[in-house]
Amino acid sequence: MRGRCYASTMSQPASQVSATLEHYLALRAEIERHNRAYYELDAPEIPDDEYDRLVRELRALEAAHPEWVAENSPAQTVGGAPSSAFLPVEHPTPMTSLDNVFSDEELAEWQEKLARALNLPPDHDGFTYTGELKIDGLSVNLYYADGVLQWAATRGNGRVGEMVTEQVLTIPGIPRALPGLTGELEVRGEVYLSRADFAAFNARAEELGLPLLKNPRNGAAGALRQKDPEVTRTRHLKALFYSLGKHDGVPVRTQGEVLAWLAEQGFPTSRYSETFTGLQAAADYHRRMTAQRAQFEFDADGTVLKLDSLALQAEAGSTSRAPRWAVAYKFPVEEVETVLESITVNVGRTGKLAPLAHLSPRLIEGSTVSKATLHNEDYIRDLDLRIGDTVVVRKSGGVIPQIMRVVLEKRPPDAAPYRFPTHCPECGHEVVRAEGDANTYCPNPACPAQQFERLRYFVSRGAMDVRGVGEKLIEQLLATGLVHDAADLYQLTAEQLASLERSGEKKAANILAQLEASKTRPLWRLINALGINHVGERNAQALARAFGTLDALLAATPESIEAVPGLGRTIAQSVSAALADPSMQDLIRRLRERGLKPVEETAPRGDALAGLSFVLTGTLSRPRDEIKARLESAGARVTGSVTKKTSYLIAGEEAGSKLDRARELGIPVLDEAGLGALLEERGV
């Protein structure tokens, strides 16, 4: 959560900043633009530390010139406008932000202000605090009435948020009901995308040629704002809860008791929270967390220190934007200088040229960094990167190494501008770059690098799943000329395979058996294996369900492909162009000649389940998306929550609160076998 936390004016006298009204208004406009990018578009344009610097300057100007301050100043407000794509919901108690401090000295100044607010001497140091991590995610508020969850909403502007109930309920560990509670209850927490899930998503997106997430916070915000909660579910969001708004009848007196009560009710809470007394203990906690930040499963950009006593919190009160009894102590942005030793350019299966920076190894946030992605030619040119340059590197979002800038005063006198390849580094073919496209491609389908990557993808587990055909074998097959593309795999003989290095008759027989078995894989696997840009497992399954047979897909128009749920124009154009390409048509023809007969999908009747509403829960043997698409293609509606209007609950292993809710309402519950029987009965 950038939070958004607002920077304190501590340690920045107003005299140090320009004091013209014109500058003030320009600064306000710039911060408002960044707020829209961050809150409403989930597309921040600058790092958090740069944003914090701008807000510190604005607040210093407003402190020096209170006559300039308007009620809607970004230094006086919280968050951004709720999205019009979701229903607005008003928080019973406002979700305020936090002030920031950046040093022990600023922390001491903040405590002095707190003491004055409580009519205590400024040097009072007997406060007991609870320390927590400041997770870089998306704040949410869960509202319960008489123990039953009514809605979940984002922070929004602090007063009004976006209702995201079904999306939030895809997150593990969120209770639908809290037995025994009466009155109103608000539970606040942070939704996040773990570093591991962020890396896995980007690796998959890069493989499919899709846009990458900039950082885990963007990933969490984008996933939570998906209109379809089943899409949210596939992003594997998590949440940690840390505070209460209204809390009728909840017997808590301290923040420590709040965290303990939340854990008792089943809410996920952080294991990094601690309670301590005094300023030195607070600073020590912050230093310990700073040292451990590389080990967290999520991104965190600081610690939060809260007065432990809820009574003292109420007495200290809040400003219009932040409580006086809590503060965010930001982690330092860890940047290191290193040397750009070289730039290599790799070629992917689509022919895309991907430049990679090789750096002198340096330790950043607990791990050694020696490489950084350079994205494309424009990225290199905009930074004016040159071999031998000293560059500043940070981990973007705490995960991906990123070159931020060049230290020009350390540039070697003989450093020359980097020239992006005009010819493919693998095959020597002249490269191409379409107008308006940031990426450069090798158009040669016979490029060895592309051949290797296409074959590796074809046999991978998510495609044709040919076990035993790994990278080393593919390299040998290409080097010996036995194979040039996927169709050639199905002409290999036992003798040819046995003659290869580290092979033999037994291994050859196993590989041939695997290849034979792959000839009758489901249609979606073949579609995925063809390596069409923007088509991975999910989209391949959607295409297979929509068209049923390979011939039907090959005959499909761009308009009919675009009509497939979840695809859209860009993917439809990519699929149409790929299937119309003569080399792709030749590959498919030769695959069929060599025995590939993918198992066809049976197209269901479009109205067989019309009027029925289904909910899926628990662990199922097939992907939820696959089951959902099959139901919807037959006219059913699939939702994320059980209501009186639900026709059937489909329950897998470890079904939780949805199963309990269905039983309470008398909703029919089917296991997968029962669903299969229903579909067979309806002709689906």
Curated annotation (Swiss-Prot):
Residues 604-684 form the BRCT domain. InterPro entries: BRCT_dom, BRCT_dom_sf, DisA/LigA_HHH, DNA_ligase, DNAligase_adenylation, DNAligase_N, Hlx-hairpin-Hlx_DNA-bd_motif, NA-bd_OB-fold. It catalyses: NAD(+) + (deoxyribonucleotide)n-3'-hydroxyl + 5'-phospho-(deoxyribonucleotide)m = (deoxyribonucleotide)n+m + AMP + beta-nicotinamide D-nucleotide. Keywords: DNA damage, DNA repair, DNA replication, Ligase, Magnesium, Manganese, Metal-binding, NAD, Zinc. The keyword Magnesium applies. The active site is at 134 (n6-amp-lysine intermediate). Its EC number is 6.5.1.2. It holds the Pfam family HHH_5. Its cofactor is Mg(2+); Mn(2+). PROSITE patterns: BRCT (PS50172). CDD domains: BRCT_DNA_ligase_like (cd17748), LIGANc (cd00114). Zn(2+) binds at residues 424, 427, 442, 447. DNA ligase that catalyzes the formation of phosphodiester linkages between 5'-phosphoryl and 3'-hydroxyl groups in double-stranded DNA using NAD as a coenzyme and as the energy source for the reaction. It is essential for DNA replication and repair of damaged DNA. This is DNA ligase. It comes from Deinococcus geothermalis (strain DSM 11300 / CIP 105573 / AG-3a).
